[in-house]
């Protein structure tokens, strides 16, 4: 998963392997080769380089290491939240995990809200 997330994050930033390697301080030639080996799972990454890559790509290191897409998405969402939102979510997540009925209700409310929002957007588009 690390290799795929590294590739995706690098491409989203519009960086070539060479440019990212150069920003890591590896030089253009060596850097390109090293990033290529990371992206093709030929070379494992050390913690120092992981932290530097995450910083250069503006993603949390945990995002690059997440076990699955849902976890990666949650990590990115938390990273983009402000302190108040992050604190609220940090207390909410364990409560939702511990109470499946509460989680089901919250999911239902979110789906309802998203449906209403989509309906409003369609009505707005039809009115234009």
For each feature predicted by the language model, list its residue ranges.
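Short basic helix-loop element that most often maps to the first helix and adjoining turn
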Residues: 3-24
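Residue-level detection of the helix-turn-helix DNA-binding "recognition helix"
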Residues: 11, 25-26, 36, 40-42, ...
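Short coil turns linking two alpha-helices in DNA-binding domains
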Residues: 16, 27, 31-34, 46, ...
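Short acidic/histidine-centered micro-motifs embedded in hydrophobic/aromatic stretches
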Residues: 23, 67, 109
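Short, basic-rich loop-to-helix N-cap that marks the start of a DNA-contacting helix
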Residues: 31-34, 40-55, 71-72
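Interfacial/linker helices and their anchor residues that mediate assembly or domain coupling
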Residues: 70-128
